[in-house]
């Protein structure tokens, strides 16, 4: 997927849902753990050298898996290439859990599933579609296969 570098840099300067200095090791063999400022903005995980304002890189948190590894560590891998893992080391187990939960909730797919779930729950209680007043109908983009209303 292609991105506009200036737009990504602008996004990286937006307020973060979470930010912390974490140990980070990239997916290349022989990669060493480095301290990085890691910043979660919408569904992007930006990582910076601790003394620089521009990101070194960014991970789009779509179609990815966040997995606990050893105590205080987790990894992110992508469905298309599960062997390519980014490893993160936190200062505590509590911080690790917070990051893992935030990263799992950051994807568009998670938000879409949540929208569908709550839309259906409200419809069950009220008998009305809560999005209808905004001109949003039963569009295919909100539907999941096998989901019952």
Swiss-Prot record:
InterPro entries: Boi1/Boi2-like (IPR045188), PH-like_dom_sf (IPR011993), PH_domain (IPR001849). This is Pleckstrin homology domain-containing family J member 1. It holds the Pfam family PH. Gene3D superfamilies: Pleckstrin-homology domain (PH domain)/Phosphotyrosine-binding domain (PTB). The gene is PLEKHJ1. It comes from Homo sapiens. GO terms for biological process: endosome organization; receptor recycling; retrograde transport, endosome to Golgi. GO terms for cellular component: cytosol; early endosome; recycling endosome; trans-Golgi network. Expressed in testis and liver.
